[in-house]
């Protein structure tokens, strides 16, 4: 199993190109099921989850071609199977996103519940409740969501803000009979990106980027060409890496307007930030200052950046509080950071961080995707060597992270075994 070996190597300097957003690419790939035409996607990150989605769509009969660099062609005209099996779904929660488009186009769908998916901690109940409101008959049997029925437009008010639920119901509504009003929608940039692609495919959607979207169903959608929005979380991760090591790095193919709160927090921590339409520059010449963090839904501070800022705060001047309001049990990186010498205590959904002068390298285990990133960031500023194990988590969301960081001066290498 691969590991990352990391040692401090001074300030980072240079340029990094940001990949397309995984959290946008996965629903966009699933949108290919809505049409018999060809959906051409550009700026797609070549990640483990993207490859799993490719296998899932191919298993349903879709024709999926890729240049293995950043482009995909998905043709749903050959789909001959409306079942998404456990073998593929178990590794990736986003697989549930085939439910809405498959049901809407074919009138039936069977999708395995994602592995470890408690209808509690990260629920799919809002997806199912919304589809039932649109006329679907749904049963959960033998670990599968089995849905059938012709969808009809209606008013759907989601009980909580859910990105996946919004995306699933939005895709389903494009082919439903009549008008669907989706209320309490997530407004993340990745949701907006999906909606804009659906419009290119012939969907009639108003209210994009707001909490209420109105979808007028059409008989069929057609193919189109679409470029995936840049990954704001990958960009934020690299910015935190520079903030902890010092230096000056320019991010290309970035989308600063999608991550303004993160940029504001970096400025508060002492970084100098410049930005244009598609680039961000960070210049850090001092020890970071501790900054309080409270995760909330977009456009607030993203939960997916909480762990990276925890690493930054661990070596910052002063103390701070980090409050996690989105997901439970999302402080699993704290014990690993403490093994490196951090001074972090937790109480419920709040972490109290007292900055230390320097961390020390250690063997640490990645427990999830963003926790992995926080350990990499910590290792870049730690005394001695840090070894991050179980980096398959990291590969789910970061494309060649060791090569990108290495290109700006980080001492980081991937090793097997």
UniProtKB/Swiss-Prot annotation:
The modification 2-(S-cysteinyl)pyruvic acid O-phosphothioketal is found at residue 117. GO terms for cellular component: cytoplasm. The keyword Zinc does not apply. UDP-N-acetyl-alpha-D-glucosamine binds at residues 93, 122-126, 304, 326. Phosphoenolpyruvate binds at residues 22-23. One of its GO terms (molecular function) is UDP-N-acetylglucosamine 1-carboxyvinyltransferase activity. It comes from the Bacteria. It is found in: Cytoplasm. SUPFAM superfamilies: EPT/RTPC-like. GO terms for biological process: cell division; cell wall organization; peptidoglycan biosynthetic process; regulation of cell shape; UDP-N-acetylgalactosamine biosynthetic process. Pfam families: EPSP_synthase. InterPro entries: Enolpyruvate_Tfrase_dom (IPR001986), Enolpyruvate_Tfrase_sf (IPR036968), MurA_subfamily (IPR050068), RNA3'P_cycl/enolpyr_Trfase_a/b (IPR013792), UDP_GlcNAc_COvinyl_MurA (IPR005750). It catalyses: phosphoenolpyruvate + UDP-N-acetyl-alpha-D-glucosamine = UDP-N-acetyl-3-O-(1-carboxyvinyl)-alpha-D-glucosamine + phosphate. Its EC number is 2.5.1.7. The active site is at 117 (proton donor). Its main location: cytoplasm. Keywords: Cell cycle, Cell division, Cell shape, Cell wall biogenesis/degradation, Cytoplasm, Peptidoglycan synthesis, Pyruvate, Transferase. Cell wall formation. Adds enolpyruvyl to UDP-N-acetylglucosamine. Belongs to the EPSP synthase family. MurA subfamily. This is UDP-N-acetylglucosamine 1-carboxyvinyltransferase. It comes from Neisseria meningitidis serogroup C / serotype 2a (strain ATCC 700532 / DSM 15464 / FAM18). The lineage of its organism: Bacteria, Pseudomonadati, Pseudomonadota, Betaproteobacteria, Neisseriales.
């Amino acid at each position: 199993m691969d590991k990352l070996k990391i040692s401090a190597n001074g300030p980072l300097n240079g340029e990094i190109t940001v990949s397309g957003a995984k959290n946008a690419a996965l629903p966009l790939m699933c949108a290919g099921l809505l049409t018999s035409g060809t959906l051409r996607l550009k700026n797609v990150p070549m990640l483990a989850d993207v490859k799993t989605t490719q296998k899932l769509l191919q298993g349903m009969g879709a024709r999926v071609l890729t240049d293995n660099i950043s482009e995909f062609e998905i043709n749903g005209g050959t789909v001959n199977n409306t079942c998404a099996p456990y073998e593929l779904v178990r590794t990736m929660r986003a697989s549930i996103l085939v439910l809405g488009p498959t049901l809407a186009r074919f009138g039936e769908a069977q999708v395995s519940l994602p592995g470890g998916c408690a209808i509690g901690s990260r629920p799919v109940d809002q997806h199912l409740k919304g589809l039932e409101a649109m006329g679907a008959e749904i049963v959960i049997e033998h670990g599968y969501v089995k849905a059938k029925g012709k969808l009809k437009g209606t008013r759907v008010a989601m009980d909580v803000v859910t990105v996946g639920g919004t995306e699933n119901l939005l895709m389903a509504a494009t082919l439903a009979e009549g008008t669907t009003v989706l209320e309490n929608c997530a407004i993340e940039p990745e949701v907006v990106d999906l909606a804009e692609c659906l419009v290119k495919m012939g969907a009639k959607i108003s209210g994009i980027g707001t909490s209420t979207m109105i979808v007028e169903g059409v008989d069929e959608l057609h193919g189109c060409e679409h470029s995936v929005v840049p990954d704001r979380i990958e960009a934020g991760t690299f910015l935190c890496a520079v903030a902890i090591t010092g230096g000056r790095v320019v991010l290309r193919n970035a989308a600063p307007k999608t991550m303004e709160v993160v940029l504001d927090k970096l400025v508060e921590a002492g970084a100098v930030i410049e930005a244009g339409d598609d680039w961000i520059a960070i210049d850090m010449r001092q020890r970071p200052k501790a900054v309080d963090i409270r995760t909330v839904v977009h456009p607030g501070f993203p939960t997916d950046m909480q762990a990276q800022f925890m690493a930054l705060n661990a070596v910052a001047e002063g103390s701070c509080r980090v409050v996690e309001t989105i997901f439970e049990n999302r402080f699993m990186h704290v014990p690993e950071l403490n093994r490196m010498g951090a001074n972090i205590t937790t109480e419920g959904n709040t972490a109290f961080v007292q900055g230390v002068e320097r961390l020390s390298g250690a063997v640490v285990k990645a427990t999830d995707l963003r926790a992995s990133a926080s350990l990499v960031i910590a290792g870049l500023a730690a005394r001695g060597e840090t070894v991050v194990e179980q980096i398959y988590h990291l590969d789910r969301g970061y494309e060649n992270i060791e090569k990108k960081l290495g290109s700006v001066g980080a001492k980081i290498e991937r090793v097997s075994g």
